[in-house]
């Protein structure tokens, strides 16, 4: 295996373009990749690839810190976060920092601290990235064998996989510790309209936790996205963190079995494709979570979900017309169904009208009015509280339906506010990124499989535009 490092000049993809731009072991002549192929030039230069990855981490953390401080600087405490286009402060608020009852921001200092910590971290990462990209050793195998690797070394690759899994498990436990011991997290279901609380009674029953994975993804089932209490969420992170850490230890201590050695492609590009496939699933899952889930993404910070805004509109007009003397239990709508209330396919009492399609919605402002058979008529007549009316009127006018030119809200709602909800931004961006990463997964998986089969020759470069251009130097 020791001889593999010296094969840096050779790579299994044949690329034919002018190699006039020399970059000391990072040019096309020695790597088979031109300057614009980026990190592909560093496939077999573990030290330089480390620099690229550390610098990339620095850019990511710099964005987090800078954007965090930007949001703090622009934040107006009197307005809800979702009306101000914020996407980072809602995450910090959800973790219980700086907020009090009802999701009201009482202290912005923790947000400032978060921004500064990320900014300082990014400087450290940036320095490390530049050091390893420009000054550090080209390869780590000779001087630092623990950090060195050869892509074909299956045992080393699964050891690296194990280390990554342990780090992910520690990350999951950080949330658990925050919820249990370090001030708790924001619970939108806390009595009286949401509050920060410590999560004490964790759900650790495997039947409940893994039951989510077995649920249908449709309708009122909603797969894991349907989770709606923090005990299950934090308990799920205990399970997830434990599985990741135990799996990490397993992968560090063992070598891949024969079936895995045969079934998988063992090359840098193959690992890239596996990672892109995983990130694609993360993106699609995050998209569904932020669009539908109002427990993990509390509506106090992210605005109502689409179904929530629709049900809020029905509730608001039920309240208004009931005050004006309508009998909401028996009033008939234009289609012959109930105007305010009707029955779902399974017999529960639900809101009538167009919002009937969202009858699965669960929201903290609405659940107190439900009985064993859906909405309770006597509670609707006697028990509606002013905070529920205010909350639903607010959500009705803030549906997450804005377009880029910000013609926002439900088309039928004349009081809708013109804004684009963070739910729209986050769901759309994660769907699009999830899709792109999936395409990248297919692309790199195809190339890696072809290279492993020995017939990858790259693209025909005879008519490459770059060939007719003046060399950069």
From Swiss-Prot:
GO BP annotation list: photosynthetic electron transport in photosystem II
Primary residence: plastid
InterPro entries noted in UniProt: PS_antenna-like, PS_II_antenna-like_sf, PSII_PsbC, PSII_PsbC_sf
Propeptide: 1-14
This protein's GO CC annotations: chloroplast thylakoid membrane; photosystem II
Membrane topology note: Multi-pass membrane protein
Phosphothreonine modified-residue sites: 15
Binding site for [CaMn4O5] cluster: 367
Positions of transmembrane segments: 69-93, 134-155, 178-200, 255-275, 291-312, 447-471
Transferase found in the keyword field: no
Role this protein plays: One of the components of the core complex of photosystem II (PSII). It binds chlorophyll and helps catalyze the primary light-induced photochemical processes of PSII. PSII is a light-driven water:plastoquinone oxidoreductase, using light energy to abstract electrons from H(2)O, generating O(2) and a proton gradient subsequently used for ATP formation.
NCBIfam families membership: psbC (TIGR01153)
HAMAP family membership: PSII_PsbC_CP43 (MF_01496)
Family: Belongs to the PsbB/PsbC family. PsbC subfamily.
Protein name as it appears in the record: Photosystem II CP43 reaction center protein
Species of origin: Coffea arabica
């Amino acid at each position: 295996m020791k001889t593999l490092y010296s094969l840096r000049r050779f790579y299994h993809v044949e690329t034919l373009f002018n190699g006039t731009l020399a970059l000391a072991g990072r040019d096309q002549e020695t790597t088979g990749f031109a300057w614009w192929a980026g990190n592909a030039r560093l496939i077999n230069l573990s030290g330089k690839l480390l620099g690229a990855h550390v610098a990339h981490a620095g850019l990511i953390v710099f964005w987090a810190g800078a954007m965090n401080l930007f949001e703090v600087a622009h934040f107006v405490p009197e307005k809800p976060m979702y009306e101000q286009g914020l996407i980072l402060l809602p995450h910090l608020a959800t973790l219980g920092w700086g907020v009090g009852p009802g999701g009201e921001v009482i202290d912005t200092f923790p947000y400032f601290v978060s921004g500064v910590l990320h900014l300082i971290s990014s400087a450290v990462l940036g320095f490390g990235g530049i050091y390893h990209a420009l000054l550090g050793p080209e390869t780590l195998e000779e001087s630092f064998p623990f950090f060195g690797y050869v892509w074909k070394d299956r045992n080393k690759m699964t050891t690296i996989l194990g280390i990554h899994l342990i780090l992910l498990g520690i990350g999951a436990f950080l949330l658990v510790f925050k919820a249990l011991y370090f001030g708790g997290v924001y619970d939108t279901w806390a009595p009286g309209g949401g509050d920060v609380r410590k999560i004490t009674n964790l759900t650790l029953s495997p039947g409940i936790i893994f039951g989510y994975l077995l649920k249908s993804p449709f309708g009122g089932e909603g797969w894991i996205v349907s989770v709606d209490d923090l005990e299950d969420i934090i308990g799920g992170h205990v399970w997830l963190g434990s599985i990741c850490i135990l799996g990490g230890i397993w992968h560090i201590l063992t070598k891949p079995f024969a079936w895995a050695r045969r079934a998988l492609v063992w090359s840098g590009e193959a690992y890239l494709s596996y990672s892109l496939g995983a990130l694609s699933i993360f993106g699609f899952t995050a998209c569904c979570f932020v669009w539908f889930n109002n427990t993990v993404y509390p509506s106090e910070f992210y605005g109502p979900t689409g179904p929530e805004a629709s049900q809020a509109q029905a509730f608001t007009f039920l309240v208004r017309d009931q005050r004006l003397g309508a009998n909401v239990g028996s009033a008939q709508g234009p289609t012959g169904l109930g105007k305010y209330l009707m029955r779902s396919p399974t017999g529960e009492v639900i809101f009538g009208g167009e919002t009937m399609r969202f009858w699965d919605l669960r929201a903290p402002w609405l659940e107190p009015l439900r009985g064993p058979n859906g909405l309770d008529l006597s509670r609707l007549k006697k028990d509606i509280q002013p905070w529920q009316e205010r909350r639903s009127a607010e959500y009705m006018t803030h549906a997450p339906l804005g377009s880029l030119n910000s013609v926002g809200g439900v088309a039928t709602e004349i009081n809708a506010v013109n804004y684009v909800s963070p739910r729209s931004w986050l769901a759309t961006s994660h769907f699009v990124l999830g899709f792109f990463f999936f395409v990248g997964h297919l692309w790199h998986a195809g190339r890696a499989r072809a290279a492993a089969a020995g017939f990858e020759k790259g693209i025909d470069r005879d008519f490459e535009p770059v060939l007719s251009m003046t060399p950069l130097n």
